[in-house]
A protein has these predicted regions:
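Function-determining sites in protein domains
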Residues: 2-165
Length: 165
């Protein structure tokens, strides 16, 4: 008689325990990584906007840009365009919005084909730094639109940067 003859192997249980655990682990992974993917995509879109905007401002320094305000179009000083770019880029990414506000925007048309539209808007969030802010809509030369609002800058700062009083 062998030492191990008295030991009887247990019956193998067939159940859903492993599959349920695997499914729960997959759900947890999706819940954890989906916000990371969303944030990475938002950051990538903002970087594309800021890079293209800076390139448009740089070309405006050589070629020029047009400013439209209250239906009147005038040429935009390269220094003013540069100040506006610094102001908008320093404010950082705002809250992406699906639609534009009503009213006449302050519009800067770059010769690269890009268009920057700015509106003064109310910021309804309680956590907002200021109750009003600026809605930014940037149309790339290929027609793609990136738009957001931010409470980090005010329309009077935009007017000051552009030399409008």
């Amino acid at each position: 008689m062998n030492l191990y003859d008295r030991i009887k192997p247990g019956k193998r249980r067939r159940g859903w325990g492993g599959a349920v655990f695997l499914a729960a682990a997959c759900v947890v992974l999706v819940i954890c990584f989906a916000p990371i993917g969303w944030a990475a995509r938002s950051h990538q879109r903002y970087r594309r906007f800021s890079t293209d905007f800076a390139a448009s401002v740089e070309s405006a320094g050589k070629i020029g840009a047009a400013l439209t305000r209250n239906g009147e179009t005038s040429s935009l000083d390269p220094d003013a365009s540069s100040r506006l770019c610094r102001l908008i880029c320093a404010a950082g990414a705002g809250k992406v919005q699906p639609s534009c506000p009503q009213g006449e925007p302050l519009t800067v048309r770059y010769h690269s084909g890009a268009v920057l539209d700015l509106w003064e808007v109310e910021i309804p969030e309680e956590t907002a730094k200021n109750p009003t802010g600026v809605f930014v809509r940037y149309t790339f030369a290929d027609g793609t639109v990136y738009q957001y609002d931010t409470d980090q800058i005010q329309m009077n700062e935009v007017r000051l940067a552009l030399g409008l009083h």
